[in-house]
Amino acid sequence: MIMRTDLYQGHDYYNMDELLTEEHKLIRDTARAWVKQEVSPIIEDAAERCEFPKHLLPGLGGIGAFGPYIPEEYGGAGLDQIAYGLIMQELERCDSGLRSTASVQSSLVMYPI
């Protein structure tokens, strides 16, 4: 198995960090740390084997990637769309399939229910 560390180092060309609240930064940094620790080391090997890393699904739930904008009274985190976008960006920067899984579950499954 090929083990990699963080495969992507983003640059804040437009100084977007200055526009984020501390809560948004915490959400983004939590997702980023999880991706770096759990996804980056295994994702290339999973892609080479044409296997979806199903064992990562509980972790996606753990970082709030499933329906983060669903109101708390319905079991969601009650976050805003910016937080959702930041989580999706962190997933996407490592693996589009993982980001697609989270966004489809959030918008096409959880939200309509």
Place the predicted regions along the sequence by residue.
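Glycine-rich flavin
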Residues: 33, 39-113
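Helix-turn-helix-type domain boundary/helix-start signal
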Residues: 17-18, 25, 50, 77
